Amino acid sequence: MGDKANTHPGAAGRATAADHPASVRNVVLVGHSGSGKTTLVEALALTAGAVNRAGRVEDGGTVSDYDDIEHRQQRSVQLSLVPVEWDGIKINLLDTPGYADFVGELRAGLRAADAALFVVSASDGVDGSTRMVWDECAAVGMPRAIVVTHLEAARADFEEMTRICAEAFGADDPDAVLPLYLPLHGPQAPDGHAPVTGLTGLLSRKLFDYASGERKESDPGEDELPGIEEARNRLIEGIIAESEDETLMDRYLGGEQIDVKTLIEDLERAVARGTFFPVLAAAPAAEGARQGIGTVELLELVTRGFPTPLEREAPRVTTVDGEPRTLDLCDPDGPLVAEVVKTASDPYVGRVSLVRVFSGTLRPDQTVHVSGHGLTDRGHEDHDVDERVGALSAPFGKQQRALTHCIAGDLACVAKLSRAETGDTLSAKDDPLLMEPWQMPDPLLPLAIQAHSKADEDKLSQGLSRLVAEDPTMRLEQNQGTHQVVLWCLGEAHADVALERLRSRYGVQVDVVPHKVSLRETFAARSTGRGRHVKQSGGHGQFAICEIEVEPLPGGSGIEFVDKVVGGAVPRQFIPSVEKGVRAQAAKGVAAGHPLVDVRVTLLDGKAHSVDSSDAAFQTAGALALREAATDARIHLLEPVAEVSVLVGDEYVGAVMSDLSGRRGRVLGTEQTSGGRTLVRAEVPEIEIGRYAVDLRSLSHGTARFHRAYARHEPMPAQVAERIRQQEQDG
């Protein structure tokens, strides 16, 4: 594994369609923004012969960062597939954004992959978000390896970074996180930094020198061997500890020299099972070089150590009616089950869907059943519809190469599935099936928007609908209380990209306006009101008088209407008219224009005219009576309160609780969870947590998560209510 003498780059270069699941590896790259994932993909593509030269992120020339937004921001904002071929194996490299706002793209990559490469910068280390993703992979048993990048940095220390990785990723078993290679350093520069020029293979005791631009293998000198023996022995012990051969440890402890072939085979099996996590090193190719440092070794690990799709547990599948269905593992001849990992709208070819096939074989012009269930609350309506597949293609960044088929275990792009959304299931039209939906984080940053002009209004709805269909981490809300269009996002960068795509893809200019919460009004004490609507200036007139009493009710009671009229002062047929007028006025509000709630309105008395009284007249009188009752009453402004649950590392619990208190929150309690984390439960006014998604990330260095849910409305403090009223008056 990476210790072979063969240095020949994959002759096939760019991969096309696979013919058997055993010849496919689906690998997602995970790491924080700036860790070097995109640069590593570029180096692997160069070594595999898929590109003639490696592009640079700074120049906008990389294969996987091809979007204009990515070029401007110089960071990935979307999932990108770069398939390459090495030693007859098709490797689907899934490059994901490292910034937390684009975790939906990461989730899509994890769903499509069978193994993960965690990319760690030698100069920056492991951040909390990367640890959290590691734990998620561990929970589902996904095989993982670690690649240390930025070895060219002046302060890069591979051995120290290996120790940090073992501490961060190997809490349960640090001896399962060990390097397979050590960096080979060139002559020391005047500044004291010795650049990395190659690698030393621990198992093979071979040197792999990349100084010439291509990998050259040699034997170390006798004086160099002692420097690697300690690391080699620890690696051997780590491999043996994870071996399924229970006699191997006894033989090793008994003094037997275990042959390298046996060790490599056991290492490969342990990696594929997800019980051993090798650490490798990589650096981009120098100008004019054909191979980056460590790229051959990494490609060897992927092809020989990472599992095939045949080794992945079959996904949970049901009929569209919810009946469980058992599938054979990744059978190209089985019933079609594929998942839309990602959708995107192209201005020239329409909607394009990246699909992972889990069973069966997908072909162009095939009619499939598209099922989408489970995200109705985010604007994704349930749908079951038959559609014809357009062209199939293998993406290579923004380029597409036509395919004749896509078998179980492989990925492809599908054109012209107009109804398919991210997370949907594709199956045979005569045997519709549904995959269990994947979990996505809740979008918790509200972005209130409105069309910039009349011309933009017609396009806004369509543009927003398409954005939400592509990205299930967005949620579209038409707030009936505030009459605002709200796009819920994961963070500010997520929101910025959404606005840019509205403009560039759909030609929609929008204005961002302050987000409002749904306030309510209520009476603080009992009050009475008289509504008089009399117009009798000749001809058919209008006459209605009613007297009401309004009293407060407990929160959540709504509007209660009671008739206590005696003696027919208000004719029976007009009492519903009074109630209708009262409820209509309550919906408009009686003080600041917010709906009135939680009151009992009692109709006490009134007067009518045999000719001039009417339904409309008593509706008007009812509304006037409620408004008069409000003029002499104390009206409380009610604000929505949210139940907030924050899962945070123990070291940040104090800061989180203090911050919640500063937002007028009430901490209800804490609960210790696994992994040194605490669940903090609180109730906080919604008006105080509009930007909490951004603020919490800063407070916890990206390691905390939170959930919010509406609890109730309750009276707003007088000084806050006055500030809100003043803001509303100022526009």
What are these regions (language model features)?
Residues 1-731:
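Structural and coupling elements of P-loop NTPases
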